[in-house]
């Protein structure tokens, strides 16, 4: 993966769990292989801000509307230990028979583009 990122001139980091990460539009993204066989590749983005728990119903309504209208990314929220809402989105593909660098790059670009679009629309709609 680092080779793909370097070929695009992207800045990246490796977190303390060994996941490859990067920043796009101030949002943090992680790129990782999942499953015991490491054949599911996931692009995972985290919204660049937390949202007040008072806005939970608005967040839920926005996510429901998004999922009714869009195939991806899969979007979700979590409540943090300090009672704030943390919004994430993911694009996962099962590459059971392998993938070329070009295929992985296409998934990365799709995951980043659709996730940043989701985040931008949520920020706009909720006035964040």
Task: Label the model's feature ranges.
Residues 4, 62-66, 125:
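Residues that form generic nucleotide/phosphate-binding pockets
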Residues 46-86, 90:
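Short, internal acidic amphipathic alpha-helical interface segments
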Residues 112-113:
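Long, contiguous binding/interaction regions
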Residues 24-58:
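Long, continuous compositionally biased terminal/linker segments
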Residues 19-21, 38-41, 85-87:
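Hydrophobic residues embedded in beta-strands of well-ordered beta-sheets
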């Amino acid at each position: 993966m680092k080779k793909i990122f370097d070929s695009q001139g992207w800045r990246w980091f490796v977190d303390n769990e060994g996941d490859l990460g990067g920043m796009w539009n101030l949002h943090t993204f992680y790129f990782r292989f999942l499953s015991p066989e490491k054949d599911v590749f996931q692009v995972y983005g985290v919204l660049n801000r937390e949202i007040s728990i008072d806005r939970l119903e608005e967040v839920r309504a926005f996510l429901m509307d998004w999922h009714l209208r869009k195939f991806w990314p899969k979007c979700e929220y979590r409540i943090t230990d300090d009672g704030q809402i943390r919004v994430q989105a993911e694009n996962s593909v099962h590459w059971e028979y392998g993938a070329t660098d070009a295929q992985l790059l296409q998934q990365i670009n799709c995951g980043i583009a659709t996730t940043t679009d989701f985040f931008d629309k949520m920020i706009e709609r909720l006035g964040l």
